[in-house]
Amino acid sequence: MATLPPTAHTSQQPVNIEDEDGILDEYDQYSLAQSYVVGGGRKGRTKREAAANTNRPSPGGHERKLLTKFQNSERKKAWR
């Protein structure tokens, strides 16, 4: 079995963005420096806006489903 060669760096230290000037071009530095990388996919809304505008489960259950079934049955009775 072949063994892997030892790595050159024994301790991994986080590299600062300014230290990587030779490695990264200006577009890479811009994309790493911007805060939009951290945000989540929330349709452009804040957590508060998303919580205020979501469909919450009804404590009564399937009220809309029962109502539409009742309305459709009444409509069928009136049609006959």
Curated annotation (Swiss-Prot):
Subunit structure of this chain's protein: Monomer. Directly interacts with MSL1 and binds MORF4L1, two components of histone acetyltransferase complex; the interaction with MORF4L1 may be mediated by MSL1. Interacts with EP300; this interaction enhances the effect of EP300 on PAX2 transcription factor activity. Interacts with PAXIP1; this interaction prevents PAXIP1 inhibition of PAX2 transcription factor activity. Interacts with COPS5; this interaction allows COPS5-dependent CDKN1B nuclear to cytoplasm translocation. Interacts with RNF2. Interacts with FOXO3; this interaction represses FOXO3 transactivation.
InterPro entries: NUPR1-like
Molecular function GO labels: acetyltransferase activator activity; chromatin binding; DNA binding; transcription coactivator activity
Function text: Transcription regulator that converts stress signals into a program of gene expression that empowers cells with resistance to the stress induced by a change in their microenvironment. Thereby participates in the regulation of many processes namely cell-cycle, apoptosis, autophagy and DNA repair responses. Controls cell cycle progression and protects cells from genotoxic stress induced by doxorubicin through the complex formation with TP53 and EP300 that binds CDKN1A promoter leading to transcriptional induction of CDKN1A.
UniProt region (Disordered), positions on chain: 40-80
GO BP, sorted A to Z: acute inflammatory response; fibroblast apoptotic process; fibroblast proliferation; intrinsic apoptotic signaling pathway in response to DNA damage by p53 class mediator; male gonad development; negative regulation of apoptotic process; negative regulation of autophagosome assembly; negative regulation of autophagy
Compositional bias segments (type: Basic and acidic residues): 61-80
Chain location of the short sequence motif Nuclear localization signal per the record: 64-80
UniProt similarity note: Belongs to the NUPR family.
Entry's localization field: Nucleus; Cytoplasm; Cytoplasm, Perinuclear region
Tissues where this protein is expressed: Strongly activated in pancreatic acinar cells during the acute phase of pancreatitis, in developing pancreas and during pancreatic regeneration.
The entry's keywords: Cytoplasm, Nucleus
Any one of the GO CC terms: cytoplasm
Domain of life according to the entry: Eukaryota
One Pfam family this sequence matches: Phospho_p8
Source species of the chain: Rattus norvegicus (Rat)
Protein name: Nuclear protein 1
Swiss-Prot/TrEMBL induction comment: Increased by methamphetamine. Up-regulated by cyclosporin A. Induced by energy nd amino acid deprivation.
